[in-house]
Each structure stands twice: as C-alpha cells, then as structure tokens.
Amino acid sequence: MNSTVVNQGLRTKGGGSLKKVLVFIESLDGGGAEAILRNTVSVIDKSKFDITVVTETDNERYTDEVRSYVHHRSFTKRNGSVLNEIVNKVIIKYSLLASEKAVRNNLIKGDYDVEIAFCEGYATKVIGNSGRKNCKKIAWVHTDVINHPWSEAIHGGAENERKCYENFDAIVCVSETMKASFVKKYGMAEKVHVVYNVIDDEETRIKSEESVNLDLPRPIFALAGRLTQVKGYDRLVRICAKLRDMGYDFSVAVLGKGEEEENIKKLISENSLDERIKLFGFQENPHKFIKNSDVFVCSSYAEGYSTAVSEAVILGVPVITTECSGMGEIFGGEDCGIICENSDEALLEAMKKLLDEPSLLEFYKEGEKKRAESFSMASRIRAVEDFIENI
C-alpha cells in the first residue's frame, strides 16, 4: 500500500527509494555560495532526494531556513554557556588537526549515495580525502582557480589540491570561464562540468518592491557583497576620489560587512568621501537597495559566477563590472551594461562613461529585460537534479 511520510519537509512516496545526499559546506553565515545552497535546497525535489546539509557551526544566517527544507547537522552547537564555548573550541580544533578521514567519520558521520563538497577549500579537502569508496563524490567550485587560487593554501599547495580533486567523480564549475580555468590548471576535462547557480528570480523581484529611502543624491552606484579584499572595494574608493576631483556628482551605496570594513572606512575618510559613499552594512534585503539605485557596480578582482550581478540584471539595473569569470555568460550576449578590463583605469573609464552619457542607462535596461528571462529558477534546479541523479 502506498503511503506518504513527512519528515522535516522531506516527502517519501512509497515504492521508491530516495537518493541520500550529503552536502558539506563550512558555513551558512551569508555569502554567495551559502545563498546559492539555500536556494537550491529550498526547491530541490524532496520526492527524489533525502538531503543532509552539514556545517561546522549552527545558528548562522541561513541555518534555520535550510533546516526548514532539509536535514541539517553541525559539528558544534551554541547555547551561550562558557562550557559550551570551550567544548566547541575543542571540536573545531580537532576538525583542523585530525585527518580528513577522521573528520568525515567522527564529525560528519553517516552513509550517503552522493557526497557533495559545496565549496572549494576545506569542504573539498575533507570529502575528497575521506577515503570513502561506496558513494559518488561531487566537488562544487565557485571561484576561478587561476585568478583567485585562495584554496591552494588549505591543501598545502596546488599539487595537493589537484590530487584531492582527482578523488572526485565529478567537478562542477558554475560558469564556462571557470571551467576553462580549472581544466587549464588541473586538467581532468572529462569530469569537469558546468551547472549554473540556482537564483530565486521571483523572490528577488518581490523583495525589490519593498520601499527604501537611500537618502543619497543621484546618480547612485550600488555595490553588494562581503567586504573582502578580492571584491575590490578599496579601488572603488580610490576611483570615486578621482571622479569627485574631476567634478562629477554621484553617490555610492555599499551593502555588506566583512573583514575589510575598517580599512574601507579609513580610506573613505582619508579621501574625504564620507558624504559620497555610505556603508549600509549587512542587509537582509539588499534587492530593494539595488532596485532603487541607478547602476550596479562589481569592482572585484576575481569572481566565480556573481549572484549579485545576476540579481541586478534580473531587476533591470544597468551593470558596470570588471572582467571576471562568468560575467559574459551572465550578460548572455545582451547589452546589460559594461564589462571592462579588470584594472583601476578601465573601471574609472566605465563609471565616467555612464556619468557622461546617462541616456545609455535606458538602453542597457532594455537589454536586461531580454536577458532576465534566462534566470528561471525552475530550469536551473532541474539541471541540478538531473546532474545529481545521473552521476
């Protein structure tokens, strides 16, 4: 007799067996890869997959939401007590010093049909070197391993990272340009694939309609993302100082937080840009800020497949971005803005161009209307499901 069992949002239809899937990611505390994982597990077919997401810690930005969709476990639990903090520190220390096999067996635990390392670095190192042979392993790569090889250090060098990736059955890059970089550096072309990020285009549009008063003079350039060195906020400040000195009127809204925040504040102050550049910090809903700006700027030195740029295109906000992995694919041949050379000078000229020719904004918005249709969440989640099913 057929029956339906509901468990933490997972629905099992009698007569069929679910594919058990482990997804390991260090954190759910904001960030592009974390948001993409949240989007993915929110809509993936629960009648096909029994998914468990494992992280190092709990009580992070997306923890409760992810837990409402799928199973979630973490190495540590937070309850605020002194003893709890001591225990958590011991567990994290163990996770860093123990072998990958020990971490997999003693902290992640469980048996799965498919094991996914959802981000390069530590997650990839643990899943790739776990020694497990009775499952399929997938490594998800969200960065350009040539232009931003940050994860090499986690493995102790590029050669160790290459050997780790050889232990995977499949490697997923989130853009064609990232795939090209990966294959150029590490080879393994036969098992490197492209699966585009799952972006909630409908939620992006709905949230963008919420009211917000930026209280800034126009035109407004908006930036969104973690305040880290690779995002290039430092050079954006220097460029704004030059534009100001050239006599241009504009303002900048920066959304996000991160380790570079104090340095950026210092740069803003040193360049007397406090009235021009406003840091709004982390925002639960960045979409309403972006929608109410005139231009979205990505000043990054390197990207994988930018969720923020994709969302700007969905919202019809013209984009200026440095040349990074995935940008051409996001534009998809449409005139969505300017992709400039990845240099301070080129970014300056791109911003200057739109200040000189504001009529271009309407032209780019028309291109974005055509392109926005390609970000369908339904089609992208089907691609993810098909990939996991057929691995």
Residue ranges of each PLM-predicted region?
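A conserved mid-protein helix/loop that constitutes part of the nucleotide-sugar donor-binding site
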Residues: G31-N39, P219-K242, Y248, V252, ...
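An aromatic- and histidine-rich active-site surface loop
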Residues: E100-I108, V114-N134
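Carbohydrate-associated surface elements
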Residues: T177, V198
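Aromatic "clamp/platform" in nucleotide-sugar-dependent glycosyltransferases that forms part
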Residues: F282, Y301
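Short hydrophobic beta-strand element within catalytic cores of glycosyltransferases
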Residues: P318-T321
